[in-house]
Swiss-Prot record:
This is 4-hydroxy-3-methylbut-2-en-1-yl diphosphate synthase (flavodoxin). Its cofactor is [4Fe-4S] cluster. Binds 1 [4Fe-4S] cluster. It holds the Pfam family GcpE. NCBIfam families: ispG_gcpE, PRK00366.1. Keywords: 4Fe-4S, Iron, Iron-sulfur, Isoprene biosynthesis, Metal-binding, Oxidoreductase. The gene is ispG. [4Fe-4S] cluster binds at residues 270, 273, 305, 312. The keyword Oxidoreductase applies. It catalyses: (2E)-4-hydroxy-3-methylbut-2-enyl diphosphate + oxidized [flavodoxin] + H2O + 2 H(+) = 2-C-methyl-D-erythritol 2,4-cyclic diphosphate + reduced [flavodoxin]. GO terms for biological process: isopentenyl diphosphate biosynthetic process, methylerythritol 4-phosphate pathway; terpenoid biosynthetic process. Belongs to the IspG family. It is an enzyme of class 1 (oxidoreductase). Its EC number is 1.17.7.3.
Length: 369
């Protein structure tokens, strides 16, 4: 039962990616990207639906050629979530997906081409009310900036971004967001800090090519956590060499840890020791798997003994403290005792019951205005 986040978010202009607000007072949006062959429409739609089920707000889809652009148009008709088209090298692909109803265009200023090509993309976006993401990446900086700085640096990333922000300003186009990604945490964090002081547009956060599930999660949590704690960031994407659904889960876990978004269960669990009165690790693994479908924000404490158990349980919607027998707390008050037999089954029932009650109470509160 933790309160609102104490973080004061950076002021930014609000834009819309489809029906999802980004920036301003909007919640921080969680984004992911498909890793299917875009030309395989059925596989891509199926993966997008899995991402939607996991709670994704925005999905990016790679569009490497014109065949993929046509497939993108078919995909767009079959999903409800806003889609961002990831465009590199060929500006004509951006023009085509704009015709096909894309919700946002992601272009890389290091490879999209001459100024007249950027103008053509901007005109197409303006005519259709499509926002743009300027996506600067340490691995694809413009050649003159590589020569000037010798290697990717925070200053180089920001100079690249500002160069293209100024270009869009000259074209009187303000409906855009910006990212300055690097695989190095310190480089990315410093680049975002510098950029946040110089523009009003929303910032899309990410540590690019962060790694596999474990290492990428840690690297992203450290980098994005630093920025989000400073109020920087309007959308996030956790780049993992893993199932994209894991990106969404990790994204929400990072936001939940900072009290910036609430979705599903926030588990508080001890690492266990010889004082535990039930198998904490086994109990946690089973509960996490069984309760993935719950979307109601709920704090659940699973503590193996009475050292910290009562204190944590009293701060949770549902809390389990190990003992002989174990004691369950509901809304901070002792509720009932449970033996280890069927412990997970009984605890799951209590959590689902509490989730249903909270959902009903939240709905009534919203209805009252």
């Amino acid at each position: 039962m933790h309160g609102e986040s104490p973080i004061k978010r950076r002021e930014s202009r609000k834009i819309w990616v489809g029906n999802v607000p980004v920036g301003g007072d909007a919640p921080i949006a969680v984004q992911s990207m498909t890793n299917t062959d875009t030309n395989d429409v059925a596989a891509t739609v199926a993966q997008i639906q899995r991402l939607v089920d996991a709670g994704v707000d925005i999905v990016r889809v790679s569009v490497p050629d014109m065949d993929a652009a046509e497939a993108f148009g078919k995909i767009k008709k079959l999903v409800s979530v806003p889609l961002v088209a990831d465009i590199h090298f060929d500006y004509k692909i951006a023009l085509r997906v704009a015709e096909l109803g894309v919700d946002c265009l992601r272009i890389n200023p290091g490879n999209i081409g001459r100024e007249d090509r950027v103008r053509a993309v901007v005109d197409a976006a303006r005519d259709r009310g499509i926002p743009i993401r300027i996506g600067v990446n340490a691995g694809s900086l413009e050649k003159d900036l590589q020569k000037k700085y010798g290697e990717p640096t925070p200053a180089a990333l920001v100079e690249s971004a500002l160069r293209h922000v100024e270009h869009l300003d000259r074209l009187d186009f303000q409906d855009f967001k910006v990212s300055v990604k690097a695989s190095d945490v310190f480089m990315a964090v410093e680049a975002y800090r510098l950029l946040a002081k110089q523009i009003i547009q929303p910032l899309h956060l990410g540590i690019t090519e962060a790694g596999g599930l474990r290492s990428g999660t840690v690297k992203s949590a450290v980098g994005l956590g630093m920025l989000l704690a400073e109020g920087i960031g309007d959308t996030i994407r956790i780049s993992l060499a893993a199932d994209p659904v894991e990106e969404v889960k990790v994204g929400y876990d990072i936001l939940k840890s900072l009290h910036l978004r609430s979705r599903g269960i926030n588990f508080i669990a001890c690492p266990s020791c010889s004082r535990q009165n039930f198998d904490v690790v086994k109990t946690m693994n089973e509960l996490e798997g069984r309760l993935e479908d719950l979307l109601v924000p709920l704090d659940v404490a699973v503590i193996g003994c009475v050292v910290n158990g009562p204190g944590e349980a009293k701060e949770s919607h549902v809390g389990l403290t190990g003992g002989t027998p174990n004691l369950v707390y509901i809304d901070g008050k002792p509720s009932q005792k449970l033996n280890n037999d069927n412990l997970v089954d009984e605890l799951e029932k209590l959590i689902r019951q509490k989730a249903a009650e909270k959902a009903e109470a939240d709905a009534a509160l919203i209805a009252r205005g």
